[in-house]
């Protein structure tokens, strides 16, 4: 029936808008502008589709959009973005903690269901989980009032040789990376030490739970850490290579 088609179309548009709001906030927060190209890449859509949607969202008062200057969320847009992000991260936490889903599967399911759960179900999930502050990847879960906790973090790739740190956050954008990180123990809460930094943007030699791993920068650029303030003597390149060879 026409009415059902209209409702389905409206619902689909609402979901798309929530996806855009979430993408803009993730890329730029509520203080900076996100580029249309970055949004297109993140959502896997064309730049033309992004431009058309941003114009519609601007007319609805959700974003401030100027061509070639990017897009920023309005106060209303920020509130809606944080509500969607909260539902997504609560769902991910529930799926991993209570249904034993792996990170990627939980992320995919949350991408769909975040648009449909009621506020009452959201509250029940939050209560069941014990009101968590972060999701399985270490990303902060906005409070019901839209408050987001912040922590001074730096990319793992910025650490100098001999520096110890604690993993706080991992990107949820690449399934293969997530599986590999979890396999070697690069998960939120894990202490790590950078033993060696290769020259000219070379690979890193990191230590996790007593085991050493040579990792390329691209493979760990989605890892964010908090320094524990400890600085140990860096391992010399030749010695590190020799030890790695014995393993």
Q: Where are these predicted regions, by residue range?
A:
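Mid-protein regulatory/catalytic core that forms ligand/cofactor-binding pockets
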Residues: 114-222
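Basic, amphipathic "hinge/linker" alpha-helix immediately C-terminal to the N-terminal HTH DNA-binding motif
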Residues: 69-88
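A short, conserved structural fragment
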Residues: 58-66
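Key DNA-contact positions within bacterial/archaeal DNA-binding proteins
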Residues: 48, 104
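Glycine- and charge-enriched low-complexity intrinsically disordered segments
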Residues: 203, 212-213, 217-247
